[in-house]
Amino acid sequence: MTKNIHDVAYELQKAIAENEDFKTLKESYAAVQADTASKNLFDEFRTMQLSLQQKMMQGQEITEEDNQQAQEVVARIQQDAKITKLMETEQRLNVVIGDVNKIIMKPLEELYSAQQQA
């Protein structure tokens, strides 16, 4: 009997929500949101990050001023223990999600590899 792929995806969603890194991420995010200085700095970082991504997607040049502003914000972020913990935890969770993505994509990878070898 074949499993419904959507049911498996919901099981995966539940497993991620129950993952210790995800729980720590939620706690870290709440701690950042509860601290006005951390929240403001994190919001500034996210705004800057989205602005740079938007420029890149539109093919606009990232200026030296953009780079300098980004470096200044990152330097301040590194001084904030709450944000640093949040970002480290998010990075660990991203590694797990990346690993899961590789596993999910394996059938397609094998299919195309077999097609190229034929």
Swiss-Prot record:
InterPro entries: Com_YlbF, YheA/YmcA-like_dom_sf. Transmembrane segments: none annotated. Pfam families: Com_YlbF. This is UPF0342 protein BC_0880. It comes from Bacillus cereus (strain ATCC 14579 / DSM 31 / CCUG 7414 / JCM 2152 / NBRC 15305 / NCIMB 9373 / NCTC 2599 / NRRL B-3711). It comes from the Bacteria. Belongs to the UPF0342 family.
